[in-house]
Amino acid sequence: VRLKILPEHKTVDIIRNMQGEYMTEAGNNYSEKKTQLHISVRNLVEFIFREGDIDTRSSRAMSADAMMEGTRIHRKIQGSMGKEYQAEVPLSLVVEGDLYELTVEGRADGIFTEDGKCFVDEIKGMYRRVELFEKPVFVHRAQAMCYAYIFALQNNMETIGIQMTYCNLETEQ
């Protein structure tokens, strides 16, 4: 199942806001070296948009088998996308604050151009009936939007779209 989303705005506000007022509120100018912080795009959006119970003991972690199966499906989908498809594109953005330097980083599953428009593809393999999805899972969309923002910023692009590719791990559809 592929869901294409063209940008409603020219930028993603999540990271833009981080570059602006949130990161510079401290207002202190210490001569000490800035603290270096690193976070993956996935961990950032999962933390920001976390829902549900604050007790995470009952949430089950993804099994090693499911992770291996997800990796296999990713590679299969990426391999079927054609020569113009760039797979596993590393992206990072450094956000400077007064007291620290935050590096937001990750890998876009794929980047491609279609009809003159650039898209970031976020692939998700899962044990759900993906054919019933009418819209992307919000946190998955947020992850793709962050990758798209970083890629667009680094390539001086005013617009960029995202594509969510969902695949059932059992049926491979």
Residue ranges and their predicted role:
Residues 93-173:
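Mg2+/Mn2+-dependent nuclease catalytic core
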Residues 3-118, 138, 142:
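Metal-dependent nuclease catalytic cores that hydrolyze phosphodiester bonds in DNA/RNA
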